[in-house]
């Protein structure tokens, strides 16, 4: 019997340790966030999402053949006040376009400072970046880990750049992804694209060929516009309730 129970017991112990580390990361993040909020920092969530070409065109690629199609990466930010008054960016992501923009984050920080004053800029940590942390940093107590750079697919986010504009950059650990209202906004944007792409499509037939032109920029702009300030208040209020629950249960 011990021979059979031992693997199960080891799994329970490892899982318990892993859950404890995740809980500690979330608590450290939330306590750091609340401290900054009490000091007068407004919360802004900064991030990106990928829009595959097939999502825009409606093309069915589930026939078993893998076809590499272009993907657009949309970068934007928002908070309880709605979308930040900053022109969002759209980058084409394919094997020929993998450059990260270095100056864009500085421009963003400057715009946010003029619009809101000092802010805590929350950026969702990419899973592979979290796994590259030193183990002692992931398990450290009493202090929140802030990487020297948070790398998104298209932008490098540097804490020193944020500080130069009076902001603080905060990395949202992957176990706390549900505390990021941007994910819900990106989901709403993608559903808008699916449900309304035909309205932004122009078709023509010439010499037996059919052509389709999609007003991509208009489609994205309208989808972002539909997620108005009222919806953002709802999204951030939901996140706030989760934060309160987590702090009350595990602090």
Curated annotation (Swiss-Prot):
It comes from the Eukaryota. InterPro entries: C21orf140-like. Belongs to the FAM243 family. This is Uncharacterized protein C21orf140. It comes from Homo sapiens (Human). The lineage of its organism: Eukaryota, Metazoa, Chordata, Craniata, Vertebrata.
């Amino acid at each position: 019997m011990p021979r059979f129970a031992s693997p199960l017991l080891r799994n329970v112990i490892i899982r318990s340790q892993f859950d404890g580390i995740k809980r500690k990361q979330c608590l450290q993040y939330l306590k750091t966030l609340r401290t900054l909020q009490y000091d007068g920092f407004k919360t802004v969530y900064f991030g990106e999402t990928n829009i595959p070409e097939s999502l825009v065109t409606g093309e069915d690629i589930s026939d078993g053949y893998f076809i590499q199609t272009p993907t657009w990466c949309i970068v934007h930010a928002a908070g309880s006040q709605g979308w930040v008054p900053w022109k969002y960016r759209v980058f084409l992501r394919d094997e020929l376009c993998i450059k990260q923009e270095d100056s864009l984050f500085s421009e963003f920080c400057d715009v946010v400072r003029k619009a809101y004053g000092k802010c805590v800029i929350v950026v969702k940590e990419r899973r592979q970046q979290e796994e590259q942390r030193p183990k002692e940093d992931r398990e450290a107590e009493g202090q929140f880990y802030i990487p020297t750079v948070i790398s998104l697919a298209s932008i490098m986010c540097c804490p020193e750049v944020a500080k130069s504009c009076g902001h603080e950059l905060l990395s949202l650990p992957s176990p706390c992804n549900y505390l990021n209202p941007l994910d819900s906004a990106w989901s709403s944007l993608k559903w808008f694209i699916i449900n309304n792409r035909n309205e932004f499509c122009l078709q023509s037939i010439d010499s037996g060929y059919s052509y389709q032109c999609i007003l991509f920029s208009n489609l994205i702009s309208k989808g972002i516009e539909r997620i108005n300030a009222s919806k953002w208040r709802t999204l951030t209020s939901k996140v706030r309730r989760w934060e309160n629950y987590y702090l009350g249960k595990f602090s």
